[in-house]
Amino acid sequence: MTIKLAIDCMGGDHGVAVTIPAAIQFLAAHEDVEMLLVGQPDVIAAELKRLHATAHSRIHVVAASEVVSMDDPVEVALRKKKDSSMRVAIKQVKDGAAQACVSAGNTGALMAVSRYVLKTLDGIDRPAIATAIPNEKGAGTTVLDLGANADCEPAHLLQFAQMASAMVSVVEHKPRPTVGLLNIGEEVIKGNEVVKQAGELLRASDLNFFGNVEGNDIFKGTTDIVVCDGFVGNVALKSTEGLAKMIGAMLREEFSRSWFTKLLAIVALPVLTRFKRRVDHRRYNGAALLGLRGLVIKSHGSADAYAFEWAIKRAYDAAANGVIARIAQAFESHHDPAGAAVPLSTSAPAADAA
């Protein structure tokens, strides 16, 4: 089966200088993939020429005249830039021309445009942003929400857990992934009212609910999935990235203090290389916008080509494993323990993550 991926080539801090090299590199390793490169044709053509890829048979250029910048407000992306590379790429998914879209554009605009174009799946009130964070077990812990919903109701956290469970079950081939609820302690009496009520809903659900988990459990890999509101999740994600960069900077500083430490660095290079690979945040780039009627993957705006290629891989894996269909199936017959559908707010806040 051929997987067709729509790439928002103009999005992010670096545009085609990152997105197109990453797409070509991914194509070289995956013969079952076709790329729809969306953006300004002359800019895309120039980059393809530079990379000697103008005649690539599995590359198709889709024209889009506008670009959503990293600081464009949501209303500009929605109402004014209707021919943006972001919107046109998402529309490829809606129209069935592509099975997934990858964009490094600004998160608020991407979530708003994706929701407007694709709509949400039946039974889902609010889409959420989910990605894997490195853990000591090596597989990564899937954490959501990472910034789409700063304020949540208990039922929203239950929905996030259901969506993530559906995704992890097919992508990681774990039929019953474990779910943890991020809290300030393991005890059921801990946390604010939203978290405590969410815990009750999760315990009453048919999910494989582990219970409350703390921040350190994300890195231990205590559960496959950790659920929280978007405010907490975004802080956790940015803290993780900052910590990884700080550790790297400290190691470089310590190993460069003297000729002796520089020699030690050479001796330890194989170990340091393996360590860097395990904690390299670029390998975990690519967050899924879960809950939509199509697959959209958000890359970091500052991603380099290596990181963006990993975001493409996330899209490929999710598309190949039918994540959207699996999530839709999970919500077809979901009811609370009393037999009534779980009540959900109809409010829909704008995405908060930067």
UniProtKB/Swiss-Prot annotation:
EC class name: transferase
Keyword set includes RNA-binding: no
Localization annotation: Cytoplasm
GO cellular component, one term: cytoplasm
MF terms (GO), sorted A to Z: phosphate:acyl-[acyl carrier protein] acyltransferase activity
GO biological process: fatty acid biosynthetic process; phospholipid biosynthetic process
EC number: 2.3.1.274
Keywords: Cytoplasm, Lipid biosynthesis, Lipid metabolism, Phospholipid biosynthesis, Phospholipid metabolism, Transferase
Domain of life: Bacteria
Disulphide bridges, residue numbers: none
Reaction it catalyzes: a fatty acyl-[ACP] + phosphate = an acyl phosphate + holo-[ACP]
InterPro entries given in the database record: FA_synthesis (IPR003664), Phospholipid_synth_PlsX-like (IPR012281)
Pathway(s) per entry: Lipid metabolism; phospholipid metabolism
Coiled-coil residue windows: none
Entry's family note: Belongs to the PlsX family.
Annotated HAMAP family: PlsX
Known partners and oligomeric status: Homodimer. Probably interacts with PlsY.
Function: Catalyzes the reversible formation of acyl-phosphate (acyl-PO(4)) from acyl-[acyl-carrier-protein] (acyl-ACP). This enzyme utilizes acyl-ACP as fatty acyl donor, but not acyl-CoA.
Record-given protein name: Phosphate acyltransferase
Upper lineage: Bacteria, Pseudomonadati, Pseudomonadota, Betaproteobacteria, Burkholderiales
